[in-house]
Amino acid sequence: MVKISVVIPVYNVEKYLEQCLDSVTTQSFDDIEIICVNDGSTDSSPEILKRYANNDSRIKIISQKNKGAGAARNVGIENAAGEYVYFMDSDDYLNSDAFERLNGFLDDEPDFVMFKISNFYEDGTKADDDDYYTMPYLKSRVGKNSFNYEDVSDFALNLCVCPPSHLFRREFISDIRFPENILFEDNVFFTQALFKAQNIYFYDEFLYNRRRRLDSTTTPISVRSIDTIEITNMILDLCKKFNHENHKKELYYRIFHNIYQIFKRADESQKPELFDKIKEEYIKSSSKWENDDYFTNNLNPEYKHMYNCAIKSGNWKQFEKCVDNYDSSLKTRFNRLRKKLA
């Protein structure tokens, strides 16, 4: 059995694909197979894959219609033969000894290994280290010891969910899949893996280099950002399944506060579509939330008000005015109270 199956979803990355494949095929640890899932590319990516496959028998190409990264990774899992599975993005690259270093953990048969990611810009310059990708809080908590969810429960949902930051035992993820046709699917996959795992290691080294193709401050807000609601509902279901419902406060914060911040940051031209999607998702989730004791009895009143505004408003302007009027009312009451206490 091959030791590591490397799964690479590929979609229109002709500019970056060679660097990605070179970093995998030249690894100092070579007991690997490389599963490239061509996810309906329309550029020269398929030709690049064929050229590399002709020169390296470890490369397997699977082609499908465009279904997104989650579906492509699932196909990779189903075709993997390795003892461990690694998910890589096709516009990034690995350090040359990444798998050799990770192999040092595998005698203990961990469910998965986590490690640090370095970010870089288009011009090749290194971005400042980001705690989300370097996880210093995880290092200080677990060090070099094996851990599980219970050891990190207070910040479990703030761990890095990026697939390239983890190496999974294939048998361990045999019943875990990425949600398909939706953004932020890696949140659900990682959360289920974290809740299920009993033997996790953190390797405090940079092994992977993640490309930042566009500054987030210039990225237009997409209606797909509202996928956060459906994804968070899936995580709420996992919390219930694994009896980890202590995360509800944080998850409802994402559903309401974070979603409204996305809406407020959007250009006015985007707000009608964003509002329609928010309202659609809130209505679709209403029976689930209204039967949840936390939502009914403990939810922040501001979030409950926002929910009601979305359900009752007929357009985005009514929604924004409804929510903002509540915020203004709170500020007015706070200022009055502060004057009385002065």
What are these regions (language model features)?
Residues N12-T26:
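Short, well-formed alpha-helical segments that are part of the catalytic scaffolds
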Residues E268-A342:
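Membrane-interface aromatic/basic loop that binds lipid-linked glycans or pyrophosphate carriers
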Residues A69, S90-Y201, R211-S222:
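Donor-binding/catalytic cores of nucleotide-activated saccharide
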Residues S23, D30, N38-E47, K65:
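A conserved acidic beta->alpha catalytic loop
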Residues V2-S5, S23, E33, V188:
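Cell-envelope/extracellular polymer assembly enzymes that use nucleotide-activated donors
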Residues V85:
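Short aromatic/hydrophobic "clamp" motif used to bind/position activated sugar donors
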Residues Q64-A80:
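Glycine-rich, basic loop-to-helix element that forms the pyrophosphate-binding segment
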Residues L207-L214, T219-N246, N258-W289:
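Catalytic core of nucleotide-sugar-dependent glycosyltransferases
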